[in-house]
Amino acid sequence: MTIKVIVVGAGGNLGHHIVSALDDDHRFTVTILARASSKSKFPSHITVHRVDDYYPELEVVEAFKGQDVVISTVTTGAIQRQKTLIDAALKAGVGRFIPSEFGHDTRNGNASKMLPQMYQQKREVVEYLRAKQNDGLEWTAFVTGPFLEVAIENFLGFNLSQQHATILNEGSDRWSATTRATVGLAVKNSLLIPEKTSNRYLFIDTVTASQNDVLLALRKMTGTEWGVDYVDAEEQKRVAIEHLSKGRLIGIPMLMRYITCVRGYGGDYLDYETSANEILSLPVRNVDEVIASILKG
């Protein structure tokens, strides 16, 4: 018997990697729930249910009927709408809900205070799921750190085209990150061992490294020296908060770099939580190998 999974937000930054991992495994039947206005293209053999952009409960319940698992990969702007999806999953008789938690450890109070619109709202969704688990809806939340191949140039401080790095403090604090393909594999494998992954957070990574480790790998893989600016992390945080106070969104990636790369804000989650890599059969990779694959595209 196949496991029936419906993915919400499959056209986004992460969704198609999860769909691909599931679709490549004959043990799963994949369906997609998409917004009516979505322009995303999906494989022709996958059933797509389109609903109003605000996810009306009646429409969503109908789409969820017969599904074993709902996986949500909705964007930050739709995080709170997951409560409607959760209620619909319960009414449709779905067995498990995986929320769009993928990223930093949102339980960290320091990070939530800094970017509540990203972290606090995600945590509230998991708490909503906790309250529903006695009603028969299991959940699994993934802490992955940033998606490495996206974040490395986006906000982690490495300009690949100019071969220049911006390093916070001495660059020695270690943090964890995961590639999107590994996230997809982790989600798929978690559904194959439901008794070990029910009603809990799963902490995974592709690499755990410091900014200095990444810089060393980039120098090695490109064969060039790279320019470096070492900057004060607290000053960067102050500037980022000032940007946000004036409505400048550039402050968000600056704070995400701080949260990731400065100890105590949850980027170092594998220092205080047990890795789920082994139970999820995730591949072991070193920093050089991962950076080389990112540079190859």
Swiss-Prot record:
Any idea which UniProt keywords this protein has?
Answer: NADP, Oxidoreductase
Q: Which InterPro entries did the record assign?
A: NAD(P)-bd_dom_sf (IPR036291), NmrA-like (IPR008030), NmrA/Isoflavone_reductase-like (IPR051609), PCBER-like (IPR045312)
Q: In which pathway does it act?
A: Secondary metabolite biosynthesis
One example of the protein's molecular function in GO is: oxidoreductase activity
Q: What class of enzyme is it?
A: oxidoreductase
| EC number in record | 1.3.1.-
The region annotated as signal peptide is none
Protein task: Oxidoreductase; part of the gene cluster that mediates the biosynthesis of the asperipin-2a, a bicyclic peptide that possesses two macrocyclic ether rings consisting of 14- and 17-membered paracyclophans. The pathway starts with the processing of the precursor aprA by kexin proteases to produce 11 identical copies of the hexapeptide Phe-Tyr-Tyr-Thr-Gly-Tyr. Macrocyclization of asperipin-2a may accompany an alpha-hydroxylation-dehydration sequence to give an imine, which is readily hydrolyzed to yield putative ketone intermediate.
Similarity remark: Belongs to the NmrA-type oxidoreductase family. Isoflavone reductase subfamily.
What this protein is called in its record is Oxidoreductase aprR
